[in-house]
Structure formats: C-alpha cells, structure tokens
Amino acid sequence: EGIKATSIENAGKKAGYPIGPLALSDEVNIALVGKIRKQILKYDDNSSTGPWDKVIDQMVSKFNRIGKSQNSGFYEYPLGEKKYIWKALESHFPVSINQIPEKDIIERLIFSQILEAIYCYQDNIITSFKDANTGSILGLGFPKSSGGVLEYVNSYGPQNFNERCLELAKKYGKRFHPPKLLVQMAKTNTLFI
C-alpha cells in the first residue's frame, strides 16, 4: 500500500509488539509467510489478497530475500553489525505520497490478530477466554499490556470495537469486517468471559 517500512516497524513497536512486523517476517522466513498466506486464501472465505501478497511473492521469487536465515529479507544482516532495513526496498516497492495514519497502522496490526482470534472463538477452535489471551501473548507476541486479544476487546468495549472494525473495513477492506459473534456482543454490550 506504499507505507514506509519504518512507519510499519515503528507502529508495531508503539503498539507493544516485541519487534516490528517486517522483522518478525524475516525471523519466521518470508517464504514460509507466503506459503501460510496461500493456505489462508485457499481455505478462508474472509481473507482477500492485498498488495502485501505481491510484496511477499516478489521478495522471495524475484529478489531471493528469504529472511534472517539467509541474512537478507526486509532487513540486511551485516556480520557483527546492527541490522537495518534493506536500502533497495523503497525503490522496488515505492512509498505512496498518501501515508496511512499511524493510528490506523497500529489498529490494523492489532485488529487483524484479534479478529482471527474471535473467529476461532466463534467456531469453538478456542474455547477459553484465558487460553485465547495467554496464547496470543505467549504464542503470537501480542502486546502484553493489553491482557491479550479478547481482553483488548473487553477494554475497548465491544460496541466501540465493532464500530471501529466497520470503519476499518470501509477504509481498508473486508478483512476488518466484524465476525457474527462480535456483532452480537456489540448489540448486547456483552464482554468475553
């Protein structure tokens, strides 16, 4: 979407994630991230392709930048030195004049994980409020200060969270559309327990 790489990384850190999303992609392996995305698109009706899919595909297939294990991904990893964002990144993926507000970047990062957790809770894949929160912090690196994915919704308020999801969906696509469970909770102002 033409967002500066530093803006993405800084937003992730401001949100409370241990590392930025691009650094995390490098740690995990960009090729693996691409394979996961393809599986999600194949089996999840709520997912849609976006500009990030092109970025992931080109990083792997065109530029052979797999991640930290190969010393080259979104970051460069010079031996014995501090990592830095790949200098050619913006020449291959130009930055847009119209930047997305930082608040939106932060909430898009956070809300995308929360919405996936709510779908899992709705479909009884996750059946415990405590497990959802603990798993999100320990397994996904979700910001600790939030208390976890479902506690975040409780703190934000189900009605407010639902409304913000609708705003994000209108601006950034259906992936932010609230799940049925959240819509029901917003109507009755019910909290996750």
What are these regions (language model features)?
Residues 1-193:
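N-terminal glycine-rich phosphate-binding loop for ADP-containing cofactors
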